[in-house]
Amino acid sequence: MTIENEALTLKKRFRGYFPVVVDVETAGFNAQTDALLEICAVTLRMDEEGVLHPASTIHFHIEPFEGANLEKEALEFNGIRDPFSPLRGAVSEQEALKEIYKLIRKEQKASDCSRAIMVAHNAAFDLSFVNAANERCKLKRVPFHPFATFDTATLSGLAYGQTVLAKACKTAGMEFDNREAHSALYDTQKTAELFCGIVNKWKALGGWPLVNEE
């Protein structure tokens, strides 16, 4: 691989990190006490031209952990009326996370990256719930960096002057259906599209590859 082609790889672009877009829906704001109810992850790939695209999607509804707090306002906000309904097809936190991590490790290895890094809108929130679930499930091999993230709320504020996901997407020229919002699946797909758009726009403006990098 030439130096020029190497600069257009996922590994080179993010310094060995493998970005994975994540969104969670929860039963409150406290990661230690409130239930994690839904999670989606979208992996990314970089084509031969150095353009970033969404790749694989994995999505789960999750059973509230034993003793979890369920805030009524949060359930009304995300539309999960009955977290215990069998119609949700929910699985345990452990099952969901293990399957997500299995996919991440496979694609991370294929990209020759050393570690996954979470991409999310207001990423500290999503990472806090994932980290809390990791602790509850006593998961030892977690692919994500424990605190580093790419936050699309911050990035879209810089790129488009908007920090709300729906407004950032619309300003970027993307379609956004507010009726679908607050579903982890839909929000993750839109966050992935937004992140790829920002990265690709920066490249198109001449910001990558770095001209002075040896």
Swiss-Prot record:
Mg(2+) 2 binds at D23, E25, H182, D187. One of its GO terms (biological process) is DNA replication proofreading. It comes from the Bacteria. Its EC number is 3.1.13.-. Keywords: Exonuclease, Hydrolase, Magnesium, Metal-binding, Nuclease, tRNA processing. Mg(2+) 1 binds at D23. Residues 20-195 form the Exonuclease domain. The record marks F29, F77, F125, F147 as: Important for substrate binding and specificity. One of its GO terms (molecular function) is nucleic acid binding. Binds two Mg(2+) per subunit. The active form of the enzyme binds two Mg(2+) ions in its active site. The first Mg(2+) forms only one salt bridge with the protein. It is an enzyme of class 3 (hydrolase). Signal peptide: none annotated. GO terms for cellular component: cytosol. Trims short 3' overhangs of a variety of RNA species, leaving a one or two nucleotide 3' overhang. Responsible for the end-turnover of tRNA: specifically removes the terminal AMP residue from uncharged tRNA (tRNA-C-C-A). Also appears to be involved in tRNA biosynthesis. Homodimer. Belongs to the RNase T family. This is Ribonuclease T. It comes from Vibrio parahaemolyticus serotype O3:K6 (strain RIMD 2210633).
